[in-house]
């Protein structure tokens, strides 16, 4: 991928444009997809912390497993907390709620300092050496655990951000995970132009992501009326709809211990007073939000649909499938 990254702008522009025409996507999406894959290749093969990270989240569902047909713009990474100076099992030590909250805040602050003082400067140095131009990487004040890479772009699209966000957190679980190949759309169409059309990335298994999404929806089902729903949250309902219509559902259903681990992890490191994680289990799982938030999610989904490049199911169809999934989980 480095050879393509170093092409002159006109050649890259032609490659992305021709790929977009073949795939029925916008030029800007094809371009950004390439840079997402390039960045993953760098992070997992040439970055100093290549052995201390794992890939998770929505982008992994589309790029590593082909489970969703949604263009996901961000790269979610798990950072080994030992990089921050913790022992392997230290975060799991028994603590009071107050002390656990203090530990979680401390781990967050250490992550922010690491990203600001060590990780981002190293990434800038490495990428400037590879790309031979001044690389624009930065951390936004209101999101200190996200490193932003503003790639040199040839196309504009108001529907997507012209940057790649590396969302990096240490308080996340690595297992189960496996190495999976990812391929840019441009390499799928014009593989002969690439010396390296794909790259192997350590990726969290989708059955864990399935339970992560289920517990997100369970929490949202209990969101208080006076608490605003985050933007772009309809993506979790779409993603779960897709996974529920794939073999991943059976794999997840066969591993209820993994659901327990996901719930325990969230309750310890992402405590939420109203989430009712103790009820996130067969028999008491709840996945359907309030009527008020259904309306909010429908509107959110309408704004997100242009990021779906495959079938675009109505949100009512998605909710019906989620309700069916809720019933299935509660009879396990």
Where are the regions a protein language model picked out?
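Glycine-rich beta-strand-to-loop/alpha-helix junction loops that act as flexible
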Residues: 55-59
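Betabetaalpha-Me/HNH-type nuclease active-site subdomain
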Residues: 62
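Structured mid-to-C-terminal alpha-helical surface segments
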Residues: 1-53, 65-69, 75, 81-332
């Amino acid at each position: 991928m480095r050879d393509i990254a170093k092409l002159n702008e006109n050649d890259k522009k032609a490659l992305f444009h021709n790929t977009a025409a073949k795939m029925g996507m916008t030029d800007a999406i094809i371009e950004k997809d390439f840079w997402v894959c390039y960045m993953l290749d760098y992070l997992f093969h040439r970055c100093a912390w290549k052995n201390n990270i794992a890939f998770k989240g929505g982008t992994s569902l589309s790029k590593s497993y082909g489970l969703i047909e949604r263009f996901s713009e961000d790269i979610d990474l798990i950072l080994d907390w030992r990089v921050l100076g913790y022992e392997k099992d230290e975060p799991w030590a028994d603590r009071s709620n107050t002390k656990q909250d203090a530990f979680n805040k401390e781990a967050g602050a250490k992550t922010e300092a690491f990203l600001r003082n060590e990780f981002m400067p190293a990434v800038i140095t490495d990428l400037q050496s590879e790309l031979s131009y001044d690389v624009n990487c930065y951390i936004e004040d209101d999101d200190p655990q996200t490193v932003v890479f503003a790639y040199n772009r040839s196309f504009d699209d108001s529907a997507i951000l012209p940057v790649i966000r590396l969302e990096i957190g240490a308080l996340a679980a690595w297992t189960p995970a496996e190495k999976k190949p990812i391929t840019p759309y441009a390499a799928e169409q014009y593989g002969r132009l690439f010396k390296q059309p794909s790259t192997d990335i350590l990726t969290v298994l989708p059955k864990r992501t399935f339970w992560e999404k289920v517990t997100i929806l369970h929490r949202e089902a209990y969101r208080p009326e006076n608490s605003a729903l985050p933007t772009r949250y309809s993506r979790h309902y779409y993603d779960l709809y897709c996974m529920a219509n794939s073999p991943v559902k059976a794999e997840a259903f066969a591993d209820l211990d993994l659901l327990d681990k996901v719930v325990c992890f969230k309750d310890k490191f992402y405590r939420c007073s109203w989430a009712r994680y103790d009820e996130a289990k067969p028999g008491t799982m709840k996945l359907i939000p309030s009527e008020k938030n259904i309306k909010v999610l429908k509107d959110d989904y309408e704004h997100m649909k242009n990021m779906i490049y495959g079938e675009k199911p109505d949100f009512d169809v998605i909710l019906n499938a989620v309700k069916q999934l809720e019933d299935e989980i509660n009879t396990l």
